[in-house]
Amino acid sequence: MKDTLPSATQVLKEAFDTLDSALENFSPVLAVQHVGWVEYIGKGIARVGGLPGVRCEELLAFPGGLLGLALDADEDQVGVVLFGDYTHLQAGDEVRRTGRVLDVPVGDGLIGRVVNPVGRCLDGGKPVAFQRQLPVERPAPPIMDRLPVTQPLMTGIKVIDALIPIGRGQRELILGDRQTGKTAIAIDAIINQRDQDVVCIYCAIGQRAASVAGVVTELRNCGALDYTIVVVAEGDAPPGLQYIAPYAATSMAEHFMEHGRDVLIVYDDLTRHARAYREISLLLRRPPGREAFPGDIFYVHSRLLERATHLNEPRGGGSLTALPIIETEAQNLSAYIPTNLISITDGQIYLSPELFQKGLLPSVDVGKSVSRVGGKTQLAAYRAVAGDLRLTYAQFEELEAFARFGTRLDEETRQVLHRGRRVRAILKQTQSSPRTAPQQVLVLHSLNSGVFDTVDEEALPAAEQAICAAVSEIPEIVDKILQGKTLSQEDLDVMHTVAKRVTRPFIKLGEEGHAGAAGDAT
């Protein structure tokens, strides 16, 4: 026992010496923290006092790890938008400044994942592995950092690629009433990017969870989730999350664009985004304007969509193509949000409920749809085979309206109606069945050259399928189409010959001679 006492004493002495040394070396640093308190809690917002120096759009920390975004700064209070469950908050709770703005994770680790607007995974997988973080709000690239839109972005949808072409870096609005196929067009465009080396982002704003789950399942089944990021702010999410969702998704897209990649982003939809911002503004007691929207609603959407562009080489050379979706009411295109977005974007694709009810899918109203930029990017082969298609279709629709009155029609008018019905039938396309550019060019050339004129209407889908399969027989012409080269008359003749041969089994009885005459005349 006596032998152990010195060792115990020695241990205690060493311990106290270590503590004394630590105390001598300890030099406390004072840290100033700006602390306020909650004065009022509303639906998704809070009013905070005691923070006179807070900056606009600064993040504030609430109890329980809840974050909020400072949007309003009055003399005595700060209006804050909350980003999570706020039911545990009460008046008097402590609020701290963070000194930073809201940012989101970006990088390849997000591809194939389903996340919320702040980057938290919603698919039950591992936490997102990210390379860096970018602010949600970023200024749009200046004019001198941009390039003209010169490369096409193929959607795989015949009526769009032929009549309303979209270029990489363009902003093309998709609008229409409820249940007219707006989301279906955007999803088909994503599916068609499978082999195009394009990163896709689908941003769901205010959608039902079941609808988003259906979209994710379709993307996964088609193999499109391998190059797609899904950003979700569900309908029951706080309005603050719905408000920042498109900005967060755009920051994720800009990371790839600045690294020289092409990106396609879909905002589904900005009508719900505008309503979420209206709700926030009314709760923050901002003065309402037209349709109760705040006065800066135009700026809210313009600063978002101006971030879509084609960058020059010093900035990375990538592109960001935006497909914003909005919902109209009773086909009213002159409402506040539709007119705002039509003026901001580079064109619009209008989906008609009347065409949808007739089963003409996609229900694109060609007369009310336009692409103000994409025409310059269209492949040369399209201009050769679909140059007059828009005019032909417009004349057909006008004549069809007059023909309903039962007047006697001359032979030329009957031929226009006959060709127009086939144009309308060929432009029909089922969902999730994109066509490649060579397939579309061969089908459209066959349409213009009269190959389909003698095919029975019921057999048109089968005849079109046969023509698409025949693309493998003309590899040299396919290469020309994909390289953007102009097709020679010899190429057109070869395409016509192939189309006539593969559609011969579908020609109506007694029309053989007429088919040959029509082809020769063309």
Curated annotation (Swiss-Prot):
**Molecular-function GO terms, alphabetical:** ADP binding; ATP binding; proton-transporting ATP synthase activity, rotational mechanism
SUPFAM superfamilies, per database record: C-terminal domain of alpha and beta subunits of F1 ATP synthase (SSF47917), N-terminal domain of alpha and beta subunits of F1 ATP synthase (SSF50615), P-loop containing nucleoside triphosphate hydrolases (SSF52540)
Domain of life of the native organism: Bacteria
Key words, A-Z: ATP synthesis, ATP-binding, Cell inner membrane, Cell membrane, CF(1), Hydrogen ion transport, Ion transport, Membrane, Nucleotide-binding, Translocase, Transport
- Location, primary (coarse class): membrane
Q: Which reaction does it catalyse?
A: ATP + H2O + 4 H(+)(in) = ADP + phosphate + 5 H(+)(out)
| The EC number(s) this enzyme carries | 7.1.2.2
Q: Where in the cell is it found?
A: Cell inner membrane
User: Its quaternary structure?
Assistant: F-type ATPases have 2 components, CF(1) - the catalytic core - and CF(0) - the membrane proton channel. CF(1) has five subunits: alpha(3), beta(3), gamma(1), delta(1), epsilon(1). CF(0) has three main subunits: a(1), b(2) and c(9-12). The alpha and beta chains form an alternating ring which encloses part of the gamma chain. CF(1) is attached to CF(0) by a central stalk formed by the gamma and epsilon chains, while a peripheral stalk is formed by the delta and b chains.
Record bears the keyword Ligase: no
Coiled-coil stretches, from where to where? none
Q: How does it sit in the membrane?
A: Peripheral membrane protein
- List site positions: Required for activity: 369
Its job: Produces ATP from ADP in the presence of a proton gradient across the membrane. The alpha chain is a regulatory subunit.
Positions bound to ATP: 176-183
InterPro entries (alphabetical):
Alt_ATP_synth_F1_asu, ATP_synth_asu-like_sf, ATP_synth_asu_C, ATP_synth_asu_C_sf, ATP_synth_F1_a_nt-bd_dom, ATP_synth_F1_asu, ATPase_a/bsu_AS, ATPase_F1/V1/A1_a/bsu_N
Name of the protein in its database record: ATP synthase subunit alpha 2
Originating organism: Syntrophotalea carbinolica (strain DSM 2380 / NBRC 103641 / GraBd1) (Pelobacter carbinolicus)
| Family from the record | Belongs to the ATPase alpha/beta chains family.
| One cellular component (GO) term of this entry | plasma membrane
